């Protein structure tokens, strides 16, 4: 079984940029899915695929890919998704002392210089939910985005909530979470495994994810790897 992910990958999804370790939420989920499908850990091979390339149309180098891919109708035109393995919220992060650190509403962020990673729903959330006056900055990786924030090139970044907790607690001097964006129009944002369009494995992988949700495995892995994320105030 070949599993794809981005290069690099970040905690709490993968630890030490090593997807093979089984440490980090998505690494652990990938091995749990493999186990459900009858693959021993040794039978799992990992490949690295850039985020945007992984959801582009055309043949894939992987059977399934776990890189915090949010399920969307637009993406479904090019790839298949499994059942969702995680329900996600988007959050705004900045550094202490920034003029926008104390914002409590989405409207207060309209004047901010905001940034996000290319092709992500985090970036889309800036455009759709915040709609800032200035064009949002776009970065190839979260590392580039963090650097821009540290250097004062942007006021704030939008990332998924577990990533926000990790960046502000472990990677960004004086990093603070401004708050999480409201979940919006009733459709929850969820991460799913990406598969080739019309892959014969899609149904099996979805059944595996559903079984892991039903038997409590997903909940336990969330507690283990993402619980420290906790909650953040919701921006009104």
Where would I find each of the regions flagged by the language model?
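Ligand-binding cleft/hinge of the Venus flytrap
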Residues: 16-19, 30-42, 122-140, 169-172
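Periplasmic-binding protein-like
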Residues: 87-94, 161-162, 169-210, 228-236
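Extracytoplasmic small-molecule ligand-binding "clamshell" domains
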Residues: 1-66, 77
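Ligand-binding clefts/hinges and TM-proximal coupling segments of bilobed small-molecule sensing domains
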Residues: 121-136, 176-178, 207-236
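Short helix-initiation/N-cap motifs at beta->coil->alpha
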Residues: 44-56, 101-102, 137-151
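Short loop->beta-strand "edge-of-pocket" segments that line small-molecule binding or catalytic clefts
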Residues: 2-6, 23, 105-120
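Flexible hinge/capping segments at coil-to-helix
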Residues: 83, 95-113
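A ligand-binding cleft/hinge motif common to bilobed small-molecule-binding domains
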Residues: 53, 69-78, 127-128, 150-151, ...
């Amino acid at each position: 079984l070949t599993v794809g992910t981005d290069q690099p990958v970040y905690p709490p999804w993968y630890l030490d940029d090593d997807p093979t370790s089984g440490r980090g939420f998505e690494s652990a989920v990938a091995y749990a899915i493999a186990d459900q499908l009858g693959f021993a850990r040794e039978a799992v091979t990992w490949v690295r695929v850039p985020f945007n390339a992984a959801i582009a149309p055309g043949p894939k180098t992987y059977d399934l890919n776990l890189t915090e891919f949010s399920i969307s109708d637009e993406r479904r035109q090019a790839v298949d998704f499994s059942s969702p393995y995680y329900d996600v919220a988007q959050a705004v992060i900045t550094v202490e002392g920034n003029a926008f650190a104390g914002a409590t509403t989405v409207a207060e962020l309209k004047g901010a210089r905001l940034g996000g990673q290319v092709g992500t729903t985090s970036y889309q959330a800036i455009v759709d939910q915040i709609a800032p006056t200035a064009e949002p900055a776009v970065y190839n990786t979260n590392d580039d985005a963090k650097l821009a924030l540290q250097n004062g090139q942007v006021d704030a970044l939008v990332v998924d909530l577990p990533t926000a907790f990790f960046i502000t607690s472990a990677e960004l001097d004086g990093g603070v979470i401004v708050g999480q964006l409201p979940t919006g129009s009733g459709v929850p944002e969820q991460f799913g495994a990406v598969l080739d369009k019309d892959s014969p494995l899609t149904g099996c992988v979805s059944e595996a994810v559903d079984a892991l949700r039903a038997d409590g495995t997903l909940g336990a892995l969330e507690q283990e790897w993402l619980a420290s994320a906790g909650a953040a105030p919701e921006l009104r």
